[in-house]
Amino acid sequence: MAKAATIKIKLLSTADTGFFYVTKKNSRTMTNKMSKRKYDPVVKRHVEFKETKIK
């Protein structure tokens, strides 16, 4: 069987609240770590979320 192109990743808040989003990314086209600016409801503002592995 072929290796799947998309993998699940966890986007963890850099505000150290422990809040995270789970999303998918194409591991063949996006080889770098993903980071997005999204809403963190714990601090009630948009912050940077960085990619970590799902444990």
UniProtKB/Swiss-Prot annotation:
Note the PROSITE patterns from the entry: RIBOSOMAL_L33
**Alphabetically, which GO biological process terms does the record hold?**
translation
Q: Which domain of life is it from?
A: Bacteria
For this chain, the family text in UniProt reads: Belongs to the bacterial ribosomal protein bL33 family.
Please give an example of a GO cellular component term from this record. cytosolic large ribosomal subunit
Pfam families (UniProt xref) = Ribosomal_L33 (PF00471)
Name assigned to this protein: Large ribosomal subunit protein bL33
Ribonucleoprotein: present as a keyword of the record? yes
The entry's keywords: Ribonucleoprotein, Ribosomal protein
Query: Annotated Gene Ontology MF terms?
Result: structural constituent of ribosome
Please tell me whether the keyword Ribonucleoprotein is annotated for this protein: yes
